């Protein structure tokens, strides 16, 4: 059995007899382009751009909530949204009450294009999923949290070790957080 969550201990599993357990981040299946970029020096951008990256989340609702939240936290900052599948931009903007001038949408990027975008932002907001690990592996500053329960263990470990900013439950983001 392979579990690539960071900070997981064998005692947390109930395994059938003769089951082998492979634990830790060395078993993360990152794309070759990501691994190659991770071996290079990290660079961060001074641009006033924050990127919201979706994993396998309920994308439109979550993105609209994050855009609305960011409008209160950082008014006027340029927001980029990166999603695997194309979002209905007009619907997301309407739900978030954001102006098109402050938001730019990207979707369907290959790994090289994603890495280029990551290097152009000041900070990335992502759930504690593979997209977070990809950005983390190339040194992109992160604010993260969990959307699914299986993300909590790794997130807690990375947070305890000062490696990420943990925003907790990203399903219920509000301007008061």
Mark where each language-model region is.
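A nucleotide-sugar donor-handling region in carbohydrate enzymes
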Residues: 2-61, 89
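Short, conserved catalytic or adaptor-binding loops enriched in Gly and charged residues
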Residues: 14-16, 94-100, 157-159
């Amino acid at each position: 059995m392979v579990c690539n969550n960071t900070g997981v201990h064998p005692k947390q599993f109930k395994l059938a007899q003769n089951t082998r357990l492979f634990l830790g981040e060395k078993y993360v299946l990152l794309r070759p382009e990501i691994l190659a970029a991770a071996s290079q020096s990290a660079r961060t951008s001074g641009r006033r751009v924050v990127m919201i990256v979706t994993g396998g989340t309920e994308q439109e609702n979550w993105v609209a909530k994050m855009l609305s939240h960011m409008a209160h936290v950082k008014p006027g900052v340029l927001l980029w949204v990166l999603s695997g599948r194309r979002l209905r931009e007009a619907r997301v903007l309407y739900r978030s009450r954001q102006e098109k001038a402050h938001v730019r949408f990207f979707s369907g990027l290959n790994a090289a294009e994603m890495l280029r975008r990551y290097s152009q932002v000041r900070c990335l907001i992502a759930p504690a999923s593979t997209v977070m690990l990809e950005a983390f592996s190339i040194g992109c500053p992160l604010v993260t949290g969990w959307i699914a329960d299986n993300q909590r263990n790794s997130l807690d470990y990375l947070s305890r070790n000062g490696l990420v900013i943990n925003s907790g439950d990203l399903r219920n983001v509000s301007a008061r957080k």
